[in-house]
Every structure is written in structure tokens, then in C-alpha cells.
């Protein structure tokens, strides 16, 4: 938890700096901005690490709370299974979104697309 927490601090502040302070700030965040970021392998890896570490870190924290405050063994098992299942589902869906995102979807308005997409 300590190591993932330190890495998460770096990933989160890097994410916030790039999205909110660099360039035009929060006003520049639109589909083209996100598409441009997810077209770059560096940001794909960055966002994947951020997703995985945040969910595993949070799931482990919730596991610790359940172990400390759920005295009934049956309730504890149900809660731990729910935490593990929800963490696994969110990691799977989030990873699918990151790796299957199409920055140049067919039929999208040209003004919403990033500059590297071919104009129809």
C-alpha cells in the first residue's frame, strides 16, 4: 500500500497537471484532447497504471476496513467477495476502454476530432 500510494501520488499529480494546468487548462478538455492523449502509447500506459493502482489500492483499503469492522464471518466474506468482484469488473472495463478507444470514430463531426484524424 505504501509503494502504490507513492506511485499514485506521482501519477495523479501528473494527470492533474497535464489536464488542468498545461496548455489551455480545463477549457481545452474535449473529445479531441482525450483522443489525442489516448492515441499516444505513453498516456495509455500512464492511464492504465493509474487505473490499476488506484483500484487495487482502494480495494485493499476497503478490505482492511471490512476485516477491522465486520465481526460476523459470513458478512465479512460477502463483503470481501463484493469488493474483489467490483474491483475486478472495474479494472476489466476500464482497461477495455483505454485499449479499445477509437480516436477517429466514423461519423463523428470533424470539429470534434483531433487534428491527426482524416477528414471525410
Indicate where each model-derived feature is located.
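Membrane-embedded alpha-helical bundles that constitute the cytochrome b-like, heme-associated redox core
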Residues: 1-120
Amino acid at each position: 500500500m505504501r509503494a502504490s500510494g507513492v506511485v499514485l501520488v506521482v501519477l495523479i499529480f501528473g494527470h492533474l497537471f497535464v489536464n488542468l494546468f498545461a496548455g489551455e487548462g480545463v477549457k481545452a478538455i474535449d473529445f479531441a484532447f482525450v483522443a489525442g492523449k489516448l492515441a499516444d502509447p505513453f498516456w495509455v500506459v500512464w492511464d492504465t497504471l493509474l487505473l490499476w493502482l488506484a483500484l487495487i489500492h482502494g480495494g485493499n483499503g476497503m478490505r482492511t476496513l471490512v476485516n477491522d469492522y465486520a465481526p460476523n464471518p459470513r458478512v465479512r466474506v460477502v463483503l470481501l467477495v463484493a469488493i474483489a468482484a467490483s474491483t475486478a469488473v472495474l479494472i476489466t472495463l476500464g482497461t477495455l476502454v483505454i485499449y479499445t478507444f477509437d480516436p477517429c470514430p466514423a461519423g463523428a463531426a470533424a470539429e470534434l476530432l483531433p487534428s491527426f484524424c482524416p477528414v471525410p
